[in-house]
Amino acid sequence: GLDGVLDVRNHLKNRIAPANPKISKNVSRLLQDVTGELSKLPGIGRRTALRLAIHLLRMEPDSVSNMTRSIDRFRRDIKYCKLCNNLSDEEICPICADRERDHTTVCVVEQVADVLSIENTRQYRGLYHVLGGVISPMQGIAPSDLKIDLLIERIAQGTIREVILAISTSVEGETTLFYLLNRLRQYPQVKVTSIARGIGFGDELEYVDELTITHALMNRREIE
């Protein structure tokens, strides 16, 4: 019957494409080591890591050298903007240094990747503030571990008129949002808004399409 067909199909699927493929012990230890390191990167499974490792082996030596130099230089020389905590080549990032942007509006995000996602929409012309994560008691991340005090210092200077909270809708994200709201109550002159919740629960901005992000920003609501 149908159940039998499905059982056979699932059996074949598991044989052909195991959920968590591992490299045979008979394979080169060097290949295993490189694949293991590559699979530590977010979004890279063992199968993709194996393909990348083999591709690296086929690349021209100069290309591999350029790649490793770029990674070394990035890790050595990259800075965090003193104002917003965004990644930058200089002490102040290009966004904060851009006088044509709206310096009265700040969009608060969790990670640098969120800045890139919003910038790709080309619809937002204000500034940003990167928290560096979300409050998570389970992971031992307290408010003091994030760049929240730096945000409050920026607001206290009196230039900012609106703070947009673009935090994920996870439990940790909601916890962070409510904590920020409590801290921002001491600045009644600042309008506090939150992006529209068209973004699904638990979704991170980094993985949301540009159209949805644009809609969420344009339809942000004020939080009383």
Where are these regions (language model features)?
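Cys/His-rich Zn2+-binding cysteine-cluster or related metal-binding knuckle/ribbon modules and their
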Residues: 25-31, 40, 50-115
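N-terminal targeting leaders
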Residues: 1-20
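Basic, flexible Lys/Arg- and Gly-enriched helix-loop patches that mediate nucleic-acid binding at interfaces
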Residues: 81-84, 95-97, 124-126, 130-153
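Acidic beta-strand-to-loop metal/phosphate-binding motif
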Residues: 105, 109-110, 160-172
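Short Gly/Thr/Asp-enriched flexible loops that form oxyanion-binding sites at enzyme active sites
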Residues: 172-185
